[in-house]
């Protein structure tokens, strides 16, 4: 099933698949928003090769909600209770900084991706869950004053029991944004290859050999920016995974 965002892909060219051996400073494996963002920043300073097994901005990056927020459900009270206030504060500040970084990239690179500042809400229609939301709001307030507030109404045509309203959040079109990053990467004299599935990575004489489509990319550094680590050893992550699906309306 294709997401609403992925309909936009037809307006962008397909990058060629890798066809020969090559050398680079950094090889980024994975063409989602994480891989593209990593390659974007690195390409300003060094040569980068990005490899994507399918099309860039597919799967998770092409099917997300388009939210650019530090509001991730009812989460911060749990984070404070389980990891401590200082850890939770660093997590919140990192997410808020990420919002500002994306805003700067969109502005500086003139990426047309429908970026817009918005409020973000987490709400409930159940009176029994109101106290949980109020505790969450107080928890966030301990980390950053005036970032959010508890409200009884939201900007949607529905009855609610209560909500937390986060200020200074945003939304964008993830596929348009991803292809905007890709254009910047190529303009920085780095390379992107689609339909180029990495099958193995070996370290030989201090370098990394990345094997893909019967070809080899030799790199000083490798960044694995895939949904999960695809190298079986030592983690055997494929044995620890479970399937999860969510939907947004």
Predicted ranges, named:
Residues 1-8, 74-81, 104-180:
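Flavin (FAD/FMN) cofactor-binding and adjacent substrate-gating region
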């Amino acid at each position: 099933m294709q997401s609403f965002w992925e309909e936009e892909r037809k307006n962008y060219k397909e990058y060629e698949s890798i066809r020969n051996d090559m050398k680079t400073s950094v090889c980024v494996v994975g063409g989602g928003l994480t891989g593209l963002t990593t390659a974007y920043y690195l390409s300003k300073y060094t040569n980068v090769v990005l490899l994507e097994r399918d099309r860039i901005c597919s799967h998770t990056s092409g099917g997300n909600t388009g939210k650019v927020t530090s509001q991730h459900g009812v989460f911060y009270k749990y984070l404070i209770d389980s990891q401590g206030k200082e850890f939770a504060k660093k997590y919140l500040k990192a997410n808020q900084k990420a919002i500002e970084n994306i805003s700067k990239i969109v502005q500086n690179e003139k990426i047309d991706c429908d970026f817009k500042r918005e409020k973000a809400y987490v709400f409930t229609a159940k009176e029994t869950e109101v106290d949980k939301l109020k505790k969450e709001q107080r928890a966030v307030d301990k980390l950053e004053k005036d970032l959010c507030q508890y409200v009884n109404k939201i900007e949607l045509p529905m009855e609610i029991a209560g909500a937390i309203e986060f200020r200074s959040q945003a939304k964008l079109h993830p596929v348009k944004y991803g292809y905007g990053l890709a254009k910047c990467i190529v303009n920085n004299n780095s390379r992107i290859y689609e339909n180029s599935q990495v099958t193995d990575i070996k370290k030989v004489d201090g370098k990394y050999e990345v094997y893909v489509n019967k070809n080899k990319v030799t790199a000083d550094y490798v960044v694995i920016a895939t949904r999960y680590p695809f190298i079986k050893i030592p983690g055997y992550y494929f044995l620890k995974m479970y399937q999860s699906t969510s939907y947004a309306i």
